[in-house]
Amino acid sequence: MKRLVYFMGGVLVIIVMLGILSVKLSADTGKSTLKNQLTIYNWGDYIDDSLLKKFEKETGYKVNYVTFDSNEAMYTKIKQGGTTYDIAIPSEYMIDKMISENLLVKLDKKKLTGFDNIDKRFIHQSFDPENDYSIPYFWGTVGIVYNDKFVKQAPQHWDDLWSSDYRDNIMLVDGAREVIGMALNAQHDSLNSTDMGKLNLAYNHLKELTPNVKAIVADEIKQYMINNEAAAAVTFSGEAAEMVAENKHLHYMVPSEGSNLWFDNIVIPKTAKNYAAAYAFINFMLEPKNAAQNAEYVGYATPNVKAESLLPAKIRNDKQFYPDNQVIKNLEVYKNLGPDWLGIYNDLFLQFKMYRK
């Protein structure tokens, strides 16, 4: 937004500044004030901006795009009320939680066009069994990015990361479910385990990984790997795709014993005001051409099979990011384990981080 430098006349200053403040407050809170406005609550840079302009041109709706940086921040804002979002894009475990707390609108499927374009493998998931509340937007995995300049033999299993060859050379994503889940999968247990014995074994196994861990970070992983500053990293497939595109020595794989299959889905929050605009946007994003353009821009895998067929061959045939059924069958979606078990996962992860120090 351009900054207005000066005004002519004191009264005009006050009037214009009040107007700017009103518009800014509307954008910051996500509150829809116009019948032709659609307020989208999404992750930053998680849609091709040219698609938003195309949507506005085709439908006449004005898009107000508001961002969040975590599922928890998004959930809190919607649960508190007082703000209105017509569309949101939460992850699967948060959708489960929001459904249970009656925070989402049950979709009228008669108003949907293009739902049949969604890959049958990615519907009827445990967090929304009948897809009554959500439509898949992007999907992906958690796996290992490795650098062939440092790694003698490509990893095949989670336990390969425990090798002394990786001493002080592994980056871990800063997430309790991801890191504890990795340790659970390494011992062939479910990453949704609520068995305290198995969780303690996973924690003890993680402690043995400590000499190999260079850092536990979030977005910084990308630059470390692109700049050849680490041999391997545990991260999300979408982030990995960006790394691989920037450095020819980087590769991504999902361990055969299992990992996380994640989803970000489109939902309509219960506080939505413009249902017509919300359905128009969902249907717009279900169109194969639009979904393909979005997937190519963002770099994440599209669940839209017709859109996938429109992607360049080098993208749709890349098994690193569009794995086959043999890989997918061993993946698990994170379940909403409830606050008590989530607290245990967080505590174990915090203990691991403190143990490293």
Segments the model singles out, each with a brief description of its role:
Residues G9, S22-K97:
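Early extracytoplasmic/lumenal segment of secretory-pathway proteins
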Residues A202-E208, E246-K270:
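Periplasmic-binding protein-like
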Residues N325-K357:
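Conserved C-terminal helix/tail region of periplasmic/extracytoplasmic solute-binding proteins
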Residues T84, I89-N212, V217-E229:
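Extracytoplasmic ligand-binding site segments that recognize negatively charged/polar headgroups
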Residues I99-K106, D128-D132, M243-V254, R316-K319:
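Ligand-binding "clamshell"
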Residues M1-I14:
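N-terminal Sec-pathway targeting helices
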Residues M94-K97, I226-N227, A232-H249:
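A ligand-binding cleft/hinge motif common to bilobed small-molecule-binding domains
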Residues P269-K329:
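Mature extracytoplasmic/periplasmic domains
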